[in-house]
Amino acid sequence: RDSEASSAIEASSTDHTVVSTVHGDGGRKAHQRIAFLAQKKEAKNDVGILMEQAALAFPVIVFVHKLANNARKVMEITECVVHDNGELEYRVLYRYRIKRNLYHGGKFTIEGEFVKENTMSEELREKLLRGGVPGPLLERFMGKEMTA
């Protein structure tokens, strides 16, 4: 996995579309895991630099979790904005909020809903447009009309 993490960062950094999986508990921890795996291959690189590279390569993290009822559920969609000074800002865009857990007759039932917590950055919006995501679809996620 260490060479795969390094290759994925490199490919994504050259504007190739890369979709990958990594075991981690949400946005920041996923980037940490990618950075630690990449550091195994490139020990000379600082983990902080690798974290920034991972965040630039993978600005969106989709966190999936297996719940008590054995269902896999998208729990969070998080964007990481890398500021000019290198600071990483994690914004949860959507979160699955569990309202209640029920246990009846040996079976778990989990009730919840998706909640929009933040709007994606303009940088991510532009990147998605360049990548071919239709404007009307992005409008739904931005929560506003897009200008030409």
Where are these regions (language model features)?
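Conserved P-loop NTPase nucleotide-binding/switch module
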Residues: 1-57, 68, 75-79
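Short, well-ordered beta-strand core segments
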Residues: 61-63
